[in-house]
Swiss-Prot record:
Role this protein plays: Catalyzes the 2-thiolation of uridine at the wobble position (U34) of tRNA, leading to the formation of s(2)U34.
Protein name: tRNA-specific 2-thiouridylase MnmA
Similarity comment: family membership: Belongs to the MnmA/TRMU family.
List of catalytic residues: C103, C200
Enzyme Commission (EC) number: 2.8.1.13
Catalytic activity line of the entry: S-sulfanyl-L-cysteinyl-[protein] + uridine(34) in tRNA + AH2 + ATP = 2-thiouridine(34) in tRNA + L-cysteinyl-[protein] + A + AMP + diphosphate + H(+)
């Protein structure tokens, strides 16, 4: 009997994943990853975070009802190094990070998989809405989930071949409604539990306040400038802004104004028109080729430049051994440094990288 460690967040998706795997004949072990929590745990509890005490309690109750072993594992140091430190450094560098992607690759997979193999597991499993397939070329790849609205492949694009070969994602074949129906049918107390907060360690979405508290440093204001370098006014610190932003700029120009660029080296935020935030080309690094050995020059794909982006046709161009360009058929709005660009062919994830410009 194959042994699988299921990462259980206390939510309905991972709970049903554990149930489905047990029904399929696996030897299932439930594990909740303790990654971060408030000093008083209060804001995590109020915002339904995946790492508060109530999440552990819910996961433990589900494991008991499924009659599977259950453990809590401490990954706080791994989470701090790979997610929180990265999050802060990216904002300080004028980029807009995606901490969930970093958490998936380096904590939920790299760290959990290593520890699971040490206790004799063959696989790890999660409640993500994605599917894993083996392609004719022998490579493992992600395939979009059965329900497009819940598909989570964008946030999983940088998983390695080794990680994919040892991962199961049983709820990828189901819709969210079907998952809740299964949970209700077998009497799980989390059947109607709301989805968890996306960024668990900034539950109030006050990134600036979090970064000031985390670093112990005050954020330094600077200048708003136009695309020609003329000073337009003062901003409250570059971490408050992201490319494409219009609301909350705190500057009145008598016309619609958008963030075009963030310049950390001069502490400037460039403001322009809506036309200024469209581009037909981006450069990406930190590449992960998934469905192919490497990205080929001239490869045609659909590229997603943010989680809720529908995707747009583009052609991949090799820039160097570590960078590629993506040339779009139609200009794209607010291509944001720090975010992921993920490439698809049909429902298959080809791979992706991090946007640098």
């Amino acid at each position: 009997m194959k042994k699988v460690v299921v990462g259980m967040s206390g939510g309905v998706d991972s709970s049903v994943a554990a149930y489905l795997l047990k029904e399929a004949g696996y030897d299932v072990i439930g594990v909740t990853m303790q990654i971060w929590q408030d000093e008083d745990n209060q804001t995590v509890e109020e915002n339904g975070g995946c790492c508060g005490l109530s999440a552990v309690d819910d996961a433990r109750r589900v494991a008991n009802s499924l009659d599977i072993p259950y453990y809590v594992m401490n990954f706080k140091s791994e989470f701090k190094a790979n997610v929180m430190d990265y999050f802060v450094k990216e904002y300080q560098a004028g980029r807009t990070p995606n901490p969930c992607i970093a958490c998936n690759r380096y904590v939920k997979w790299e760290s959990l998989l290593t520890r699971s193999l040490q206790i004799g597991a063959d696989y790890i499993a999660t409640g993500h809405y994605a599917r894993i397939v083996t392609l004719p070329n022998g490579r493992f790849a992600l395939k979009k989930s059965a329900t497009a609205a819940k598909d989570q492949t964008y946030a999983l694009y940088n998983l390695t071949q080794d990680q994919l070969s040892k991962t199961l994602m049983p709820v990828g074949e189901y819709t969210k409604e079907e998952v809740r129906e299964i949970a209700a049918k077998i009497g799980l107390l989390v059947a109607n539990k709301p989805d968890s907060q996306e960024i668990c360690f900034v539950p109030d979405n006050n990134y600036a306040g979090f970064i000031e508290d985390y670093t112990g440093q005050k954020i330094i204001p600077g200048n708003f400038v136009d695309t020609k370098g003329n000073i337009l006014g003062r901003h409250q610190g570059i971490i408050h802004y992201t490319v494409g932003q219009r609301k909350g700029l705190g500057i009145a120009l008598g016309r619609p104004a958008f963030v075009v660029e963030i310049r950390p080296e001069t502490n400037e935020v460039v403001i322009g028109s809506n036309d200024d935030i469209f581009t037909d080309r981006l450069i990406a690094n930190k590449l992960n080729a998934m469905a192919v050995e490497e990205f080929e020059d001239g490869m045609e794909v659909i590229a997603k430049i943010r989680y809720n982006h529908e995707g747009s046709k583009c052609t991949i161009r090799k820039v160097s051994d570590t960078e590629i360009a993506c040339e779009f058929e139609t200009p794209q709005r607010a291509v944001t440094p720090g975010q992921a660009v993920v490439f698809y062919q049909g429902d298959i994830v080809v791979g992706g990288g991090t946007i640098i410009k």
